[in-house]
Amino acid sequence: MDKSESTSAGRNRRRRPRRGSRSAPSSADANFRVLSQQLSRLNKTLAAGRPTINHPTFVGSERCKPGYTFSSITLKPPKIDRGSYYGKRLLLPDSVTEFDKKLVSRIQIRVNPLPKFDSTVWVTVRKVPASSDLSVAAISAMFADGASPVLVNQYAASGVQANNKLLYDLSAMRADIGDMRKYAVLVYSKDDALETDELVLHVDIEHQRIPTSGVLPV
């Protein structure tokens, strides 16, 4: 074998890949494929659950019933002394209340603690007599009778506890928008005084669509 043949043979040997060196996937490749599959499934889930005019997302957690949307009220409780109570009737905007016969299916309250929140509060929603002045004594009795679900919201290091929502189903009661003034959100400050800069309540009322609801709620 002359020198040129020897050089060519050496070059061919160098070009021959080692067995399995390029075919075996790395752990990074495997992780990337798993991540891609997860993202694909997530995109499909999000696409299926995106709100539409007929199916707006109810309080960012689930779809409204077909033919329903929701209106929102934001409540900021005043200072509540330790062991005392606060109550506020549900007063919807005039643009909604003029359709007072539209049915209401659910009320959901989201408790949003502000950065200074370090207390324990009990929150509920109740139908209260028109004659009630929502005094401390009256609200105390409503919390004690066990007639409505109560959400207990406590300080959490993350700022918001895992379960910060209370859902009140009115479907069986055939309640309508006009009835909402008969309902009130009630708050009990258990451990110490609740200051004005500690808590915000977001109340979402799911009701039949009304002519003014031509766009998705925010």
Swiss-Prot record:
Spans annotated as Disordered: 1-28
Keywords of this entry: Acetylation, Capsid protein, Ribonucleoprotein, RNA-binding, T=3 icosahedral capsid protein, Viral nucleoprotein, Virion
UniProt biased composition (Basic residues): 11-21
Domain of life assignment: Viruses
A GO MF label: structural molecule activity
Description of its domains: The N-terminal arginine-rich stretch does not seem to be the major RNA-binding region that allows formation of an infectious ribonucleoprotein complex.
Function, as annotated: Capsid protein. Probably binds RNA and plays a role in packaging.
Membership in a protein family: Belongs to the cucumovirus capsid protein family.
Name by which UniProt lists this protein: Capsid protein
